[in-house]
């Protein structure tokens, strides 16, 4: 297992008022993303636990692209990865942002 952490300043607060959401499932080749609205509006944090050791630079690129596209201000993401491909990671992060922007608790 490898633990990775990324912190990014962001342009804007993520939409919505929902406090948390979870998307995905840890299974063969997939990942689970928990997103929580717990940070200041100008910050984003992403913590990753992955079984795929040695892919830190790939994660850095995928996370950097995600933050640039979505500006997820105020959100902390906790990822449990079972070996997902970069496109699946991007999809799950986008789903997490959409989920937390929905109405509800």
UniProtKB/Swiss-Prot annotation:
It is found in: Cytoplasm. Covalently binds the prosthetic group of malonate decarboxylase. Its main location: cytoplasm. One of its GO terms (cellular component) is cytoplasm. It comes from Bradyrhizobium diazoefficiens (strain JCM 10833 / BCRC 13528 / IAM 13628 / NBRC 14792 / USDA 110). GO terms for molecular function: acyl carrier activity. This is Malonate decarboxylase acyl carrier protein. It holds the Pfam family ACP. Keywords: Cytoplasm, Phosphoprotein. Subunit of malonate decarboxylase, it is an acyl carrier protein to which acetyl and malonyl thioester residues are bound via a 2'-(5''-phosphoribosyl)-3'-dephospho-CoA prosthetic group and turn over during the catalytic mechanism. InterPro entries: Mal_deCO2ase/Cit_lyase_ACP (IPR023439), Malonate_deCO2ase_dsu (IPR009662). It comes from the Bacteria. The modification O-(phosphoribosyl dephospho-coenzyme A)serine is found at residue 28. Belongs to the MdcC family. NCBIfam families: malonate_delta.
């Amino acid at each position: 297992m490898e633990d990775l952490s990324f912190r990014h300043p962001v342009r804007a607060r993520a939409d919505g008022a929902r406090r948390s959401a979870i998307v995905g499932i840890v299974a063969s080749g997939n990942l689970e993303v928990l997103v929580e609205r717990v940070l200041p509006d100008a910050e984003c944090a992403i913590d990753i636990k992955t079984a795929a050791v040695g892919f830190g630079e790939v994660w850095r690129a995928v996370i950097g692209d995600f933050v640039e596209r979505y500006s997820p201000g105020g959100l902390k993401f906790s990822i449990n990865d079972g070996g997902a491909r970069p496109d699946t990671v991007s999809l799950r992060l986008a789903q997490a942002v959409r989920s937390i922007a929905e109405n509800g608790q």
